[in-house]
Amino acid sequence: MEITMGVMDENATNTSTNYFPLLDPLGAQAASFPFNFSYGDYDMPLDEDEDMTNSRTFFAAKIVIGMALVGIMLVCGIGNFIFIAALARYKKLRNLTNLLIANLAISDFLVAIVCCPFEMDYYVVRQLSWEHGHVLCASVNYLRTVSLYVSTNALLAIAIDRYLAIVHPLRPRMKYQTATGLIALVWVVSILVAIPSAYFTTETVLVIVKSQEKIFCGQIWPVDQQIYYKSYFLFIFGIEFVGPVVTMTLCYARISRELWFKAVPGFQTEQIRKRLRCRRKTVLVLMCILTAYVLCWAPFYGFAIVRDFFPTVFVKEKHYLTAFYVVECIAMSNSMINTVCFVTVKNNTIKYFKKIMLLHWKASYNGSKSSGDLDLKTTGVPATEEVDCIGLK
């Protein structure tokens, strides 16, 4: 959903406005930042602007973003549900890494089933016009923002956990009480940092052409608070992108050196070789996820920086919306990549989910098994090599 984030002069008129409508990436986890969207020439009456939503390139971009949203709803909705269901049923899956992944899965699942339908209506059906009221506008924007930060912070926590487990194996591992506190910290930090995205979110009616109005939903910062807006964006850019990416890169670089370039002392038994293979597989998947995160979100942050700090670059740019949609689709695809990697590659959770369905089907078909028998069987299923791999210390 296009969120109108920006700065607005409260005393400005419709003919000469200092208002920068912002495309807040509600549809792509971008809904979290104050990003200025210059819809037209700032000194030009808005009702003389061309309606870019009627162009062919915009139509093609609309189709692409619609397909991306459908993909998110299907892949993230179904895939993350499978992961969460398997984790809830099988205790052997509940190691620290999987618990951290579960938080990422929960946040993406909520976005897929709650936010994406509204984004589909905003981006594709109504072509950048919000018709669901201020409360939902702020709520969807806030949930999108929190989800993005939870994903980033969870990936950072996973990288640090892998670093401690592999590079410093003699140190005591984190207890479940500490892990619970870490998970709570991931959510609390994300919830607090995202508060401005809800506080400054509002609806604004804009006249795009003489006879057409569109209701933009997004963050609007008063013009006298522009310095705070830019400071907030740089703060977010630092603690939710640059900082985590640098930290994760250093962690995985050190882990790679430990696993691939350092000789293992002593006699290598089959169990030791198996553990090494498992750890390498896990780290490779996590490194691919980090690479995908950077490739998906770096263009979006770069686009936002140019838009917010060098707005004249986009003045009178006819294909601005199309460019935004391309960047938006790339960013949105990151959640699907995470889901595919964590669910189908790293954890073999589909196999466990099939066992859940099979056991429930047998119980209902036979009508003789009690829920206690069912729980006894499901909690006693031995862990697979993939699960053991993740839990190796």
From Swiss-Prot:
The keyword GTP-binding does not apply. GO terms for biological process: cellular response to hormone stimulus; circadian rhythm; G protein-coupled receptor signaling pathway. CDD domains: 7tmA_prokineticin-R. Residues 1-63, 120-145, 201-232, 304-322 are extracellular. Keywords: Cell membrane, Disulfide bond, G-protein coupled receptor, Glycoprotein, Membrane, Receptor, Transducer, Transmembrane, Transmembrane helix. The keyword Repressor does not apply. GO terms for molecular function: G protein-coupled receptor activity; neuropeptide Y receptor activity. This is Prokineticin receptor 1. It comes from Bos taurus (Bovine). The gene is PROKR1.
